[in-house]
Amino acid sequence: MDAVTPKATAVGIDEHSHVVRPAEMEWQKTSFPGCWAKPLLFDAKSGLATMLMKFDPGAVLPDHEHVQIEQTYVISGKLVDKEGPAEGLTVGPGEYVWREPGSRHVAWTPEGGIMIAMFQVPNKFFHEDGKVTDQNGRDWREAWGHTGKG
């Protein structure tokens, strides 16, 4: 596995266990205003990722598709489906939601929030100009087409 964890250290005698200290990490901007991330685990080859996500009040994750199963645990705030088949679905603190491969929606955080999100491969974000990108604004097919998962 080619996974990395920024600022992680191997623990004791087990070099295969990695401790991550998110409090020591800086929030990284995503390509979406008001959406921030701390990558707890990221495999640049497969796209496998676990991210601590922070959303400013009113932040929107635009139209996107979950290429594989996505899992989210809400620590604070609310995650609301703004558009899509589950429009109005609200996930609050202490709640967990997982979404099936191929599910597509627009999400927002009316009051902001902090969540842990787990991805098997990055989501596809659909832009009005026809572009399809990952969360960092990279062309999805160029960045993740090699995974064969989308």
Q: Model segments located where?
A:
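Conserved catalytic motifs of the protein kinase core domain
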Residues: 48, 70, 112
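A short, N-terminal "cap"/entry segment at the start of jelly-roll beta-barrel domains
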Residues: 1-47, 131-150
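Glycine- and acidic-residue-biased ligand/ion/polar-headgroup-sensing regions
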Residues: 57, 66-84
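Short acidic-glycine-tyrosine-enriched beta hairpin
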Residues: 82-104
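Short, well-ordered beta-strand segments in beta-rich or mixed alpha/beta enzyme
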Residues: 53-55, 74-79, 93, 107, ...
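Ligand-binding loop in jelly-roll beta-barrel domains
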Residues: 101-126
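Conserved short histidine dyad/triad with adjacent acidic residue
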Residues: 34, 38-41, 46-66, 91, ...
